Amino acid sequence: MTTLTIEDLAVMLLPGQAIAGLDLGTKTIGLAMSDLGRRFATPRPVIKRVKFTQDAQTLLAFAEKEKVAAFVIGLPMNMDGSTGPRVQATRAFVRSMADKTALPFVYWDERLSTVAAERALLEMDVSRAKRAERIDSAAASFILQGALDRLSALGRPAFPDLDS
């Protein structure tokens, strides 16, 4: 397993491969999945955290079932750009995954993703109880969508041009 930049991931991905987005929390792991065209991120049910070994098994079973080619994981930077304990915990999680999978990880700045997810859920008039259940996966979706938008801006098509 390696960590890549989004630019390196763009070069490595094959057409039609999906990407998973992760929002790592202390109690849950928010999940999102791209479509095969890598244009849209869709929230998926959260993984309830237990212990790292079980969390990794659940995540990798999801990745195998969904044919995930890479993970984009939110990096919870402070608003001033500095790092703190949550960034260290996220990097430790990714390092620990190195023993479990060859799938690459891309770190993605997640500042304000939870705020944006909360706002979107409020605009959809989702109840407080349902928001609490869905916020982490909604945040993972915002994280993944940012990465998908960057991949698109890099000009790497998800599918080859069939007219050439």
From Swiss-Prot:
A cellular-component GO term for this protein: cytosol
Record EC number: 3.1.-.-
Main location: cytoplasm
Hydrolase recorded as keyword: yes
A molecular function (GO) term: nuclease activity
Signal peptide span: none
Metal-binding in keyword set: no
GO biological process: rRNA 5'-end processing
Cellular compartment(s): Cytoplasm
InterPro entries in UniProt: RNaseH-like_sf, YqgF, YqgF/RNaseH-like_dom, YqgF/RNaseH-like_dom_sf
A Pfam match: RuvX
UniProt keywords, alphabetically: Cytoplasm, Hydrolase, Nuclease, Ribosome biogenesis
Stored NCBIfam families: RNAse_H_YqgF
Family, per entry: Belongs to the YqgF nuclease family.
Function: Could be a nuclease involved in processing of the 5'-end of pre-16S rRNA.
Name under which the protein is recorded: Putative pre-16S rRNA nuclease
Source organism per UniProt: Rhizobium rhizogenes (strain K84 / ATCC BAA-868)
